[in-house]
Every structure is written in structure tokens, then in C-alpha cells.
Amino acid sequence: VKKLTSHNIQSGLYISLQSTSTKVLENIKRKNLKINKIGDLNDLAKENSMPLLTDLILGMPGETPQSWIKNIENVFKNDITNMDVYYLQLLVNAPMNVDQKEEYTLETFGAYDYFYETNVETIQKEIEAGVAESIQVIKSSNTMNHDELLDASIFSWFVLGTHCLGLSHLLAHYLHNTNGIKYTDFYLGLMDYLKEHDSNFNTWIDEYGAKDIRILRTYFGNIDIRHH
């Protein structure tokens, strides 16, 4: 990894956590990376001047709103700020789609903009012609309903923007190290403050969710994922 990074082929040491919940990792048969090893990996990355990167997948079987918040807390308290968040996708013939969809009541919708070089007009034409490509993306489960998943998504993108890509991680680290304040408590409190005092922030939340027209906006900007 160090050699790849030195030649700008790889940006750092990447570990795909997906979740830090023991229950979730058991459900997806992936209990092979214990959270207490992340600190060791991060130390190794720092010794070699490499950033540690990871990802979380929202909507996994058995994931709850509470365990999702804990996922983010575990990532941040292990000093990882390079994080991506993805929605769970159910692939054709994958074990989760075949064996676990009914068990965990995994409700999905067809997303047509999870591919490169797509736009709404092109997607609509392809749908009408019957040639559109789509992928099934999580909408709810028996442990996280649609509204809870949407709230978790909003919080995730909030911390990605402020902590991972912004400057608030400096304050969050300070409060955590000096006063023992959880990272997620800090960001939940910051969200509450902005909801009360910043109309632009509330506008962003409304636009992101757009619950009344059942459109879930994601990181693809002006392209909408439509529920079918």
C-alpha cells in the first residue's frame, strides 16, 4: 500500500468496515474485523504517513438508528476522518438478496442514477424504451423504517461535510479529548442548534429529504432517485 501511495496510485490504507455492529457483522457473515483492531491499523498507517480510509453501508440487516450512530462514533474515536457512506444495494443472486431479503424485510427501490454519465432526461427515455439500467437500493428494513433511514442518511452527510471534509473535527477532537464528549453527541447537538437558528440548514434538510414527494436525494446532486 505504501508503494502504491508513493506513486499516487492509491490514496491511503483502505479498510471497508461496512458496520461496527457485532450483530450486523454476524448477520452478513463478515465478523472478521474487530473494531479494536482499527486503532492498530491507524497507528500503522500513521507510522508510514498514510491516511486511513473506510466506508460504512447504511441499511444493513439488523442495523438500527442507534447502532448506526454508534458506527460513526467508533470510526471517529479511532481517529479516522476519511470516511464514505453508501446505501445498501441488493445485487441479483447475491445471498443477501436471495436468503435475507424476506428475513429482514429489506424493502428497496429501483435507482437509475447509480451509474456514470447519467441524467434525468436520459434515464426517463431509457425507462420508456425499456432499456434502463437500475439497481435495488435499500429503503427500509425491519429494524430501520424509511423515515429512520432518511434521518440516518441526513446525519451521515452532515458529519461527512462538517467532520470529514470541514474544520469542525478540530473542535470535536478537542472536546472529546479534554471533556470526554462523544463525537456523535457533539454533532447531534450541532444539528439541533442549526435547526433552531439557521433557516438555510432547514432548507437543506427539506430539499434532501423531500419526503412529501417521495424522492430521496443523494450525493449525485441534481439527479433524483425515484421510488418505483
Question: Predicted regions span which residues?
Answer:
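Terminal or standalone catalytic/regulatory effector modules within metabolic enzymes
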Residues: H173, N177-H228
